[in-house]
C-alpha cells in the first residue's frame, strides 16, 4: 500500500500484532528517526536496548538503518508486545516497499505472526490451568 502525501513523499505502511498489541507503521524516506505515538522511540520504549533492537531489527538486516523515518501508532498490551508488533509491521512495510526484501525477512522470521495469546481462565480453576489443591482424604 503506497500512497502520496501532501509534500509528495512516498509512504509505505504495514500493520503488526502481538498478544493484544497493535502497531500501525509508516515508513517515509528520511534520516532514520523512530517516532512512536508522537514520542521519540527511545523515550517511549524506556531507553531499553532490547526493545530498540527488536524494533529496528528488520532495517538492520537489510542495511537500511538511517534511510527511513518510522512513524508508529501503537495501542494495547505492554512494551514487549508493542516492540514485537512494531517489528512485524516494519517488516511488512519493507516488503511492500521492495518485494525482493521478502525472502531475506522471511528467512529471519520477521514476517511470521506470533499467534500465542493469553489463555482464558476457566470456571472451577484459579487461573487458566491452575486447579485448587486436591485432598484425597
Swiss-Prot record:
Source lineage: Eukaryota, Rhodophyta, Florideophyceae, Rhodymeniophycidae, Gracilariales
Transmembrane intervals: none
Species of provenance: Gracilaria tenuistipitata var. liui (Red alga)
InterPro entries referenced in this protein's UniProt entry, alphabetically: Ribosomal_Su5_D2-typ_SF, Ribosomal_uS9, Ribosomal_uS9_bac/plastid, Ribosomal_uS9_CS, Ribsml_uS5_D2-typ_fold_subgr
GO molecular function: RNA binding; structural constituent of ribosome
Subcellular localization: Plastid, Chloroplast
Family stated for the protein in its record: Belongs to the universal ribosomal protein uS9 family.
Disulfide bonds: none
Biological processes per GO annotation: translation
GO cellular component terms given for this protein: chloroplast; small ribosomal subunit
Coiled coil region boundaries: none
Keywords: Chloroplast, Plastid, Ribonucleoprotein, Ribosomal protein
Protein name per its UniProtKB record: Small ribosomal subunit protein uS9c
Amino acid at each position: 500500500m503506497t500512497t502520496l502525501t501532501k509534500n509528495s513523499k512516498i509512504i509505505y505502511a504495514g500493520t503488526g500484532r502481538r498478544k493484544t498489541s497493535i502497531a500501525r507503521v509508516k515508513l517515509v524516506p528520511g534520516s532514520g528517526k523512530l517516532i512512536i505515538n508522537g514520542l521519540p522511540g527511545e523515550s517511549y520504549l524506556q531507553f531499553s536496548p532490547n526493545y530498540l533492537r527488536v524494533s529496528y531489527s528488520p532495517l538492520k538486516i537489510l542495511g537500511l538503518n538511517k534511510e527511513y523515518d518510522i512513524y508508529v501508532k501503537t495501542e494495547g498490551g505492554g512494551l514487549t508486545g508493542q516492540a514485537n508488533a512494531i517489528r512485524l509491521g516494519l517488516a511488512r512495510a519493507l516488503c511492500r516497499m521492495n518485494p525482493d526484501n521478502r525472502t531475506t525477512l522471511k528467512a529471519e522470521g520477521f514476517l511470521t505472526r506470533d499467534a500465542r495469546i493469553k489463555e482464558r481462565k476457566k470456571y472451577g480453576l484459579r487461573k487458566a490451568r491452575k486447579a485448587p489443591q486436591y485432598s484425597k482424604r
